[in-house]
Amino acid sequence: MAPISIRDVKKSYGKHPVVHGVDLEIQSGEFIVILGPSGCGKSTLLRMIAGLEEITGGEIAIDGRVVNQMEPRERGCAMVFQNYALYPHMTVAENIGYALKVAGVAKTERSRRIAEVAKALSLEPFLDRRPAALSGGQRQRVAMGRAMIREPKVFLFDEPLSNLDAKLRIAMRAEIRRLHRRLGATSIFVTHDQTEAMTLADRLVVMNGGRVEQVGTPEEVYHHPVSRFVAGFVGTPAMNLLEGTINDEGVFVYDQSRKIALPRERAAALKGKRVVLGMRAEAARLVVPDAPGALVATADFIEELGASRVVHADFDGLPFAVALTEAVSVKSGDPIGIAIDHNAIHLYAADTGRLIENSAMSGAGAVHA
């Protein structure tokens, strides 16, 4: 186990910056997930930690030692890649133990440690097979075993589950979490998959455009997103976002005429401001269209998710998602009313996209169509 300090780390390719001054403190034994869309710099940051990319600026320290000038093999990290990176001509046992062989570890000790790793990853029946004879999940476990056997201070995972089908991804998420509990090593996992991020992380690091948008537990990031980007990126469905203006009466006005009344004490300081109102799908519920204060819309399509459903509504071209857990009869094309939980509203500055502090609403008024 080892703490990691990332201080004002930058990366540029020529004149093109791709990582802009990232600061992050990772505790010893912590499981960190870096989440973001393609091209946000998350894999580049991971590769700089591993030593596979040069650092343009800033400093990375692992276990108290600055590693900027260290070779990858000197950093105490083991990396698991998306494409497994197994040697096709070697057996599972040979793949797992290859790093020890190169390091000159005695054959008896190699065999003992290979057996331990194979048992931990349920690979014992496959030790004499070659990668071509394995399933995708088995190959990924071999890749993990090859990292485990080195007994590293830090595990680095670069989208390791992307090539697996949905069922295998679920199984491998559980496998990785069990592995982390067993070994206790500091782990950094890069993904664009929100489900992976939310289920694996002790803390999430959400990146966008080479910058860190938010760091926090999955619960903090989901329930208290600090920017419009995080609100719209984290969560399935994404947070409902409506852009409008706070008028002189302290009412949020969007789509020219639709209105949501806000608490006077919050709206008073925001009169005349362009803001983005955000609300999770589960903070809304369906009511009859003529219910007092209901937002009138049309059910566009319904996602059936087994234990729950999501109604994707359309009102004059604006999308709005409502999560249902109770049995409600609704089908595409039905007129619906939407009631919202004003305690769950967040406001973001339209120009910067940042959360307006203390913008979680309480005691707000009705919604008017």
Swiss-Prot record:
Described purpose of this protein according to its UniProt entry: Part of the ABC transporter complex UgpBAEC involved in sn-glycerol-3-phosphate (G3P) import. Responsible for energy coupling to the transport system.
SUPFAM superfamilies: MOP-like, P-loop containing nucleoside triphosphate hydrolases
GO BP of this protein: carbohydrate transport
Gene Ontology CC annotations of this record: ATP-binding cassette (ABC) transporter complex, substrate-binding subunit-containing
Keywords, in A-Z order: ATP-binding, Cell inner membrane, Cell membrane, Membrane, Nucleotide-binding, Sugar transport, Translocase, Transport
Membrane-topology annotation of the record: Peripheral membrane protein
Domain of life: Bacteria
Classification via CDD domains: ABC_MalK_N
Subunit note: The complex is composed of two ATP-binding proteins (UgpC), two transmembrane proteins (UgpA and UgpE) and a solute-binding protein (UgpB).
Pfam families referenced in this protein's UniProt entry, alphabetically: ABC_tran, OB_MalK
Family in the record: Belongs to the ABC transporter superfamily. sn-glycerol-3-phosphate importer (TC 3.A.1.1.3) family.
Residue ranges occupied by any ABC transporter domain in the UniProt entry: 4-234
Species for this entry: Rhizobium etli (strain ATCC 51251 / DSM 11541 / JCM 21823 / NBRC 15573 / CFN 42)
Keyword DNA damage: no
Gene3D superfamilies: 2.40.50.100, Nucleic acid-binding proteins, P-loop containing nucleotide triphosphate hydrolases
Reactions catalysed, as given in the entry: sn-glycerol 3-phosphate(out) + ATP + H2O = sn-glycerol 3-phosphate(in) + ADP + phosphate + H(+)
EC number(s) per entry: 7.6.2.10
Protein name (record): sn-glycerol-3-phosphate import ATP-binding protein UgpC 2
EC class of the enzyme, as a word: translocase
